[in-house]
Amino acid sequence: MLHSNIIGEGKPLLILHGFLGSGDNWKTFAKKWAEKGRSVHLLDARNHGKSFHSDEFSYEIMSQDVIDYANNQGIDKFDLLGHSMGGKTAQFVAQQFPERVDRLIVVDIASKAYPPHHTEILEALSELDEQQFESRKEAEEFLMPLFPETDLRQFLLKNLERTHEGVLSVKCNLSLFRSHPERIGKALPKEPRIHTPALFIRFESKTFQAVNDTGALGGVAGVGYAVQFDDIPIS
């Protein structure tokens, strides 16, 4: 079963994080939405965060993980928000289990195929893992020349956890991701079509545009590498 952090009470909202992320990436926004009467479930995908590792890793399998989680929690229908990899998983859930999803929000991803583009990050995390640093400061100093963007470094550092030996280790399943990078970018099937009410949000530089199921567009400034916004219409 997927690890989760549940915040608030009310109508369920399930949030699926992006590649190399975890549910906690959305904790700040989950608290705000919980204040509006939502029960926000921050899920860690398999091979990420505190969830289990498995060589089985596909959007079909990850979408079934979401349904299995909802069944275990006694949740029949839910709103679903997915970012990046989580956005593809969310789309697959809406395709295959339309009766379970009330509303769908997809952030910064389409259903098309993407070429592998995380090689540099995965290699850096692998090298960092081998260093067995004892402090996050050491780990950040190691990453700084490779990734000068502070937001990206902080995002990657969230992958670290302290072992029983007192050193920092990468939580995600690096060996799998490095062996099969193509699985992340795989296209979703074109059928069945999604008929769930949906909002698709795309990023353009430091702004993003929102495209909903009626074709309306909107923009919000100030969005960087890590998702940093709270104007998604969830209520």
Features from the language model and the residues they span:
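Alpha/beta-hydrolase fold catalytic core
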Residues: M1-L14, E35-R38, I75-D76, E182, ...
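Serine-hydrolase catalytic-loop signature spanning alpha/beta hydrolases and amidase-signature enzymes
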Residues: L20-T28, V40
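The conserved beta1-alpha1 loop
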Residues: L14-G18, R202
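Conserved serine/cysteine hydrolase catalytic core
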Residues: E165-A221, Y225
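Conserved alpha/beta-hydrolase catalytic His-Asp/Glu region
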Residues: Q131-L188
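Flexible "cap/lid" loop of the alpha/beta hydrolase fold
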Residues: Q91-Q96, D102-E134
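Active-site loop/oxyanion-hole signature of alpha/beta-hydrolase fold enzymes
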Residues: A30, E35, S39-L81, M85
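Active-site glycine-rich loops that stabilize anionic/oxyanionic intermediates
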Residues: G10, G18-G21, S84
